[in-house]
């Protein structure tokens, strides 16, 4: 166990265009090799595309997608007497959001398509409509937790 104190959580500054911390976090997840301006242009163009295709406010569609992707429970491995159990645990809100963003970006990259902008836009729209690979991942996580409900008393 570490003897040091807890690390202070640093606040995430909101993005300059939509003034949203959620978008700022997404830009950081999309960013590769420190190219933040490229990442932000990808995210903003994807949102513009979402706005065109849906005819709704792109930020609202994005927030709905993240809400749909956020898991409520997950399983964590816990070793008890030589056996490893998958113990279902509730997900804290900050971790749930982080997982949702991670899945959104990961499955956008894995998706077929020409540009990252179009792939991200399509994944956002799919998540808002409760379809797509990222939603499937959340459902799978919930199924795993449901299947291992018997080990819930091993919670720590």
From Swiss-Prot:
What molecular function terms (GO) are annotated for this protein? Answer: mRNA binding; rRNA binding; structural constituent of ribosome; tRNA binding
The record's annotation in PANTHER family points to:
RIBOSOMAL PROTEIN S7
Show the CDD domains listed in the entry.
Answer: uS7_Chloroplast
The protein's name: Small ribosomal subunit protein uS7
- Assembly notes: Part of the 30S ribosomal subunit. Contacts proteins S9 and S11.
The protein's matches in InterPro entries, at most eight in alphabetical order, are given as: Ribosomal_uS7, Ribosomal_uS7_bac/org-type, Ribosomal_uS7_CS, Ribosomal_uS7_dom, Ribosomal_uS7_dom_sf
Coiled coil stretches, renumbered = none
An example of a Gene Ontology BP annotation on this entry?
Answer: translation
Has the keyword Cell membrane been applied to this entry? no
Question: What does the UniProt record say this protein does?
Answer: One of the primary rRNA binding proteins, it binds directly to 16S rRNA where it nucleates assembly of the head domain of the 30S subunit. Is located at the subunit interface close to the decoding center, probably blocks exit of the E-site tRNA.
The family annotation for this protein states: Belongs to the universal ribosomal protein uS7 family.
Keyword set includes Signal: no
Q: State the SUPFAM superfamilies in the record.
A: Ribosomal protein S7
Ordered alphabetically, the record's keywords are: Ribonucleoprotein, Ribosomal protein, RNA-binding, rRNA-binding, tRNA-binding
Which Pfam families does this UniProt record tie to the protein?
Ribosomal_S7
Q: Which Gene Ontology cellular component terms are annotated?
A: cytosolic small ribosomal subunit; ribosome
Q: What HAMAP family does the annotation carry?
A: Ribosomal_uS7_B
